[in-house]
């Protein structure tokens, strides 16, 4: 039993370090492309995505992180109300989040509503960029910076240089 626990801890540490690099690259792209954007919002199931949120917060040093906890799709309306009132500079999707992660219907809802109020969304997956995130870099992108020019136009922001358009 002890070996299984050690193996699980090792796997968590390895996957956490992989995520750290992914969020580092994403935050770096955000800071480089939009240097005036310092307030980052994250909408996720806080309990289920706690590790990823901590890693993201570490990567986003010097930026203010606003965490909006959602337990299910029924909470997305309240989350949108908070986002509309607080109007963050950018929203980052948490890959793998069971409620609002890349590829989910809640993420699509969030991306569309954020574009309406000119707030760009960033992701770590190709799925997130295809859904309408302006920028994405992470494991599913092979480390390549992916951009969505249409989403950038709708959100009123510049397209990151050197990205591959989707």
Predicted features along the sequence, with ranges:
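Sec-dependent N-terminal signal peptides
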Residues: 4-14
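Short hydrophobic alpha-helices and adjacent helix-cap/hinge residues
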Residues: 16-166
């Amino acid at each position: 039993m002890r070996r299984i626990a050690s193996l699980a801890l090792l796997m968590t540490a390895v996957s956490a370090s992989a995520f750290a690099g992914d969020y580092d690259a994403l935050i770096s792209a955000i800071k480089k492309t939009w240097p005036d954007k310092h307030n980052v919002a994250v909408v996720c199931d806080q309990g289920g995505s706690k590790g990823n949120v901590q890693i993201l917060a570490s990567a986003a040093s010097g930026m203010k992180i606003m965490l909006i906890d959602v337990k299910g799709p029924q909470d997305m309306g309240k989350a949108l109300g908070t986002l509309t009132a607080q109007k963050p500079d950018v929203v980052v999707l948490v890959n793998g989040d069971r409620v609002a992660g890349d590829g989910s219907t809640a993420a699509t809802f969030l991306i569309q509503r954020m574009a309406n109020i000119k707030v760009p969304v960033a992701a770590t997956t190709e799925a997130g960029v295809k859904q309408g995130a302006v920028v994405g870099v992470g494991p599913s992108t092979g480390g390549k910076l992916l951009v969505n020019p249409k989403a950038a136009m709708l959100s009123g922001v510049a397209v990151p240089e050197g990205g591959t358009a989707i």
